[in-house]
Amino acid sequence: MKRILATTVAALLATTGLALAPSAGAAECPSGNFCVWQEANFGGQRANWSGDDGWWESWISDTDSSWANHGISGPGIKDHVRVYENAWQGGGMTICLAPGQEVGYSGAANDRGDSHIWATGC
């Protein structure tokens, strides 16, 4: 039963583009991804996405404490990341990251993120 559950979870994570990993730093955020950690200074569990997500999974929703934008940048590319306090980009924007920006902690954005989109600017 445990093997079936583990296989199912792995398949689900692979299809949604979400990855879980303990992280020691922002450098571990894969190229082309936006990453969020549960702890300040890129500690604890990490979630990463290469696309938009209108409804973060419950373990990371409202527990985000550090962020890194390692997205691809270029003319006309949506390379900024806007994080919102409610699902489906509802409520206010809690933080916006420019290409390459890494934020180890923000009191204004801490534990408030529920969704994000890639955009052409903040």
Model-derived regions: residue spans:
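Compact beta-sheet-dominated domain cores in extracellular/mature segments
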Residues: 2-9, 14-17, 22-122
